UniProtKB/Swiss-Prot annotation:
The gene is gluQ. It comes from the Bacteria. Keywords: Aminoacyl-tRNA synthetase, ATP-binding, Ligase, Metal-binding, Nucleotide-binding, Zinc. This is Glutamyl-Q tRNA(Asp) synthetase. It comes from Pseudomonas putida (strain ATCC 47054 / DSM 6125 / CFBP 8728 / NCIMB 11950 / KT2440). Its cofactor is Zn(2+). Belongs to the class-I aminoacyl-tRNA synthetase family. GluQ subfamily.
Length: 300
């Protein structure tokens, strides 16, 4: 896998929020990490809206996300990509995988599977169900998939034993995250993925799908999640407060500390653009803690 250079203009990163709510501090840490990692090597930073699940989308969230990123100085390159406009591309790949026998229809209910701890037992693997009204699962091999994360180090997962065949299209017709993210990263030419450590165990599934479709493997950097005292990550479902424009500078500095970066107290009087300019020049991804969570209470 190629290494990063100080001026790697071939670098293409991305931030891919879900418009199910407003951006919060945890979102900021992820966006800032991916932005800095791209800008520090003069790379491109793309923005993709992962809006494949309309029932979960919050009215006004799309525009609010764009406005918040702009007010915090996190400007992106090119046009925003909306996954809701990419359904034809997803459908073509699902059809291809199904017709090749690499995917199959699954009629299992959540209740049937709830005692299997998220590992699909293969009930429908050889059942030959019709596609109508069924989910589509991708067959996985009995293999271990490994990769080296730039922060978390070596990671491996036995797909067959630890995951099982996974859904690429839901029974309601909506496309699964695992499919959409792989297709869109390849289509956009993404070379580097910087995201939260909650997606670390998703990566082997994505590596397998990349391999199956002949895509290049990006570099991965999974940052620690910011968690509340009860251990839950900051998120929309826990009513984490949305980012406010008037707090941009102190929150950017706090996010930098969450990423292990040094901050100068004098920057509290700086503009967001000035904070980002300094952070970009001093970006050290190797300073990010090799852990999967950071308690919010530990951040001053």
């Amino acid at each position: 896998m190629p290494s990063l250079t100080m001026t790697d203009s071939s670098y293409i990163g991305r931030f891919a929020p879900t418009p199910s709510g407003f951006l919060h501090f945890g979102s900021l840490v992820a966006a800032l990490a991916s932005w800095l990692d791209a800008r520090a090597v003069n790379g491109r930073w793309l923005l993709r809206m992962e809006d494949t699940d309309p029932p979960r989308e919050m009215p006004g969230a799309r525009d609010a996300i764009l406005q918040t990123l702009e007010r915090y100085g996190l400007h992106w390159d090119g046009e925003v990509v909306f996954q809701s406009q990419r359904h034809d591309a997803y459908a073509a790949v699902v059809d291809r995988l199904f017709n090749m026998g690499l995917a199959y229809a699954c009629t299992c209910s959540r209740k049937q599977l709830e005692s299997y701890n998220g590992i699909y037992p293969g009930f429908c693997r050889n059942a030959g169900h019709a596609r109508e009204g069924a989910a589509i699962r991708l067959r996985v091999p009995e293999l271990i998939y490994r990769f080296t994360d730039r922060v978390q180090g070596e990671y491996q997962q036995h797909l067959g034993r630890e995951v099982g065949d996974f859904v690429i299209q839901r029974r309601d017709g909506l496309y699964a995250y695992q499919l959409a993210v792989v297709l869109d990263d390849a289509w956009q030419g993404v070379t580097d993925i910087v995201r939260g450590a909650d997606l670390l165990d998703n990566t082997p599934r994505q590596l397998y799908l990349q391999e199956l479709l002949g895509f290049s493997q990006p570099r991965y950097l999974h940052i620690p999640l910011i968690v509340q005292p009860d251990g839950h990550k900051l998120g929309k479902s826990y009513r984490s407060p949305p980012l406010q424009a008037e707090h941009a500078t102190p929150l950017l500095l706090r996010a930098l500390r969450a990423l292990g970066q040094e901050t100068d107290p004098e920057l509290l009087l700086a503009t967001p653009a000035e904070v980002l300019a300094v952070a970009r020049a001093q970006w050290r991804p190797e300073a990010i803690a090799q852990r999967t969570t950071v308690p919010e209470a530990d951040l001053r």
